[in-house]
Structures are given as C-alpha cells and as structure tokens.
Amino acid sequence: MKTRDSQSSDVIIIGGGATGAGIARDCALRGLRVILVERHDIATGATGRNHGLLHSGARYAVTDAESARECISENQILKRIARHCVEPTNGLFITLPEDDLSFQATFIRACEEAGISAEAIDPQQARIIEPAVNPALIGAVKVPDGTVDPFRLTAANMLDAKEHGAVILTAHEVTGLIREGATVCGVRVRNHLTGETQALHAPVVVNAAGIWGQHIAEYADLRIRMFPAKGSLLIMDHRINQHVINRCRKPSDADILVPGDTISLIGTTSLRIDYNEIDDNRVTAEEVDILLREGEKLAPVMAKTRILRAYSGVRPLVASDDDPSGRNVSRGIVLLDHAERDGLDGFITITGGKLMTYRLMAEWATDAVCRKLGNTRPCTTADLALPGSQEPAEVTLRKVISLPAPLRGSAVYRHGDRTPAWLSEGRLHRSLVCECEAVTAGEVQYAVENLNVNSLLDLRRRTRVGMGTCQGELCACRAAGLLQRFNVTTSAQSIEQLSTFLNERWKGVQPIAWGDALRESEFTRWVYQGLCGLEKEQKDAL
C-alpha cells in the first residue's frame, strides 16, 4: 500500500453530506484553506436518503418549537440562495375523519408562535387546489412547505467551495485521527480508488459525518451516543400530487406525501436500530405495508399507482434513553466543541438537525472553527446565491432557446444559470442518454468536468441518470460508455460499474418487486444479461 505525502490546510471536514458541503463552502468563503474528505460520494448518507422536503417547520411546531423556528428561517433563505434546487410547492396539513379535528387549532396556534404562515382552508378548496388529496378530509391547513433536491443542493455547495479554493476528496475514508497530546491536528485517510494512504494536517478538524460521527469520535477515545432511527420511504413512478400533503397530527409513520422532480415520495417510518446496523439500508416488507396503507389515506390514487422503488436512511439524532421510537428526540442542532466538553482541542462535532437546516449548522460549525483560528470574517452564506441560482430560470431559458424545449428545460432545471456556459447546439447536446429525465451526453460531459464524478453512481446523483421510470434499463449502458469516452473509466471499469449500478437499482426495487415493477426488472435482466452479455457472476442478484 502506497503512502502519499501529507497535505496541510486550515480545516479538515469529515463528511460529504449537505452539512459537510455547507461547512466547506462557508469556510472557503471566509478565506480558509479547506480539505473535505468523504469515504464514498457526496450525499450518500442521510442527505440523499430523505423526503427532500423543504420544511416550513409546521411539522415540528407543536412538538419542537425551536426546530420549527429554525426551519421556517432556513426555508426562506433557501428559496433565495438555492432557487434551482428548490420548488415552492406549498403544503397541506389535512385532517381525516379518524383524526382529532380539534388538533387543527392547536397546530395553527403553534405555527403562528413559530412565525410560520398557517391558513385554515375549506376542505372543498383543498380538493380544488390538490386533486390527489383524500376527498374525505374534514379539515385542511395551507403552509409554505416545498421540495428540495438534496443531491443538487449538496453538489452546488461543493462546487462553490471548490471555486473558492477548497479541496474535495471523495472516495477517501478516514482511518484515524492524528493527535499531539491533547490536540487533534489531522486525519489519516485511505483512497478507495488507488489504495493509497495519506496524512492530512490542520489545526481544526470538523466531524460532520452524521450518524457515523460516533465512530469518528471513537478514534479520539470520545463518546457521542447517537440514536440510530431508520426511516423508510417509497417512490411512485410519476408525480401524483403537486402540493406536499401531511397529516394534521403529531408526527407518525407514513404521514407525508412529497412531490419531487418527476415522482412523488411517501414516508417515513421510524424504527430504532442497533448502531452496528447503520449501513444496512434494506426496507422490510412490514415497512412497505405500512407506507402503502397509510399513504393511501393521504392520496387514494396511490392504490392504483406503480411503486418505483423503496429506500431508507438513518437519522443522525443524539440519543435519549426513554424514547424507543426516536419520534420525540429533538431534530435540533448539536454542536460539540471537544476542547470544552472533553479537553481535546482542535476537534469539533456538528450533528443532529436535518437537511433543511444544513446551512445554519454549517454557519455554527464555521463560527466555531473561526474562533479557534482567530478569523473574524462574517458568515455570508445566507445572502450569497449558490452556483446555478444567480438568476431566475426564466432568464436563463431565454439564453438557450436554440435547443428543443424538453432538453433545455431539464438542463436549466437541474443546473440553473450555469447551463448556458456548457449547453450548445452541438451533437452531444442533442444526444439523449436518459429519456426518462431528459439527460443529454453534453450534460454528462459537464458533470464529469465540473461536479467531481468518479463513477456511474456518482453520475446518477449529479444528473438523475437512471432515476426515472426505467431505473437504468435504457440509459445505464449509454452512460457507462460515455464515462469511458470522457476518460473517467476504462472499458473494464465501465462494465464493472454498469453491473454495480444495476445491482444498486435492484436493491431498491426488490422490496416492491411485484406486478409491473417485477416485470420491468425481469426485462432489464434480459436486456443486460442476455442481449448485452453481462455474465451472471458479474451481476450478482440480477
């Protein structure tokens, strides 16, 4: 195993989720030398395994007022700085005949106290503005919920950090902390792509590894007791609702239906798991049954809608001994300066919170870093737009009128005002790779050159290749070939990554493999194993 020379910086950030990316951006904007390390790819943990809900905070207004206030504040900020990552759909909190209608008044009052707009509307009006909603509802409250693409949001933060000098090291796993007495002064990492090991040095190390933060802290003989609460979700094969639909009750299983991009999602469950199971993301048959049964109460059309796939994530909550479900644990932010808490200088942990509050978490963590380094520059991330969100989509679209509307519309939707810099009338930009999501070869090239793509799975998270109805059946082989063409992979690596990609898609289909989903999977297997010649031993489960 080779060892590379060490690198030095002002701060090392462990974790490539939204929070880690936000910290990298904030630190870089304040003039710090930044290195971020992530063992897999960006947004592969809890960041990429949630609803993608742009919380208004209403969901937490009754049970967690502090989190509710944080959510509505960040909701308004993200609508300004990340406009190409969010969709302000608005949301409905509905009361069904089996629910307590008197809770609605409590809910509205709690929202108002948290600064959240909450308007009670007539059930008939709710049915008009959201045809998918259960027509049996007896009450409805309109709130400023929305949706956010977590992959796009994380990638935009990473891109801005890189453009301000940050070094982003994906596929680099932390194998230990470097200490000098009672001070952490760096990390040891292993590059999964090359097998090389390396020492990285900095006066401050930030642990932003989410639920895996407990494991990172153990390298310093510290204990952060996390509460692993698994949440599972289902993806519909098309977008069945235009508003976020919530149950107007205290948070419970399967009580949010979220429209996102071309699909809708129903979730979540909440199940306490052992810490040694946090990398096991399998969705059980029981969870699927709960999600379907409860989801149909929100939108009866779900009963006739094909389920595309299932997935789950683990919430990075700080543990409480008296709550077996995790529902009553605060979603609030936890910032630990280990110099004050444990007498270990140079080490900070940021955890808790949620995707919605990633920017605020990053601000808190960066403030702590700057205090240690004597940096007095203020945070500007609440005011500076992310790359892609400098101008409205309508303005950008007028700059790329020469291409067919579906192609330019999808490109601008995903990349915002960065699109005109790479979109052209050339053959690459008219060559479709993924019909479901209207991804062109030109967009693949842009992602490879600018968005830190090392594999086919990385490309999926940057462009939505393989995330549509066919689940990679028609586009995965094209995308794999393009990665070789653009010098990301060799031919052998492309074949290996194609197998890995299809198996990852199958993991999400397997829990709901009946009817159309099973037939589609069998056809995919026939296409790649029979027609394209991928051998059984290469394809594992498929």
Swiss-Prot record:
- SUPFAM superfamilies (UniProt xref): FAD/NAD(P)-binding domain
- Record-listed E.C. numbers: 1.1.5.3
Keyword annotations of the record = Cell inner membrane, Cell membrane, FAD, Flavoprotein, Membrane, Oxidoreductase
Where it sits in the cell: the answer is: Cell inner membrane
* Presence of keyword Cell inner membrane: yes
Return the Gene3D superfamilies for the record.
Answer: BFD-like [2Fe-2S]-binding domain, FAD/NAD(P)-binding domain
Cofactor(s) in the UniProt record = FAD; FMN
Role played: Conversion of glycerol 3-phosphate to dihydroxyacetone. Uses fumarate or nitrate as electron acceptor.
Q: Which family does it belong to?
A: Belongs to the FAD-dependent glycerol-3-phosphate dehydrogenase family.
What is the protein named? Anaerobic glycerol-3-phosphate dehydrogenase subunit A
Lineage at the top is: Bacteria, Pseudomonadati, Pseudomonadota, Gammaproteobacteria, Enterobacterales
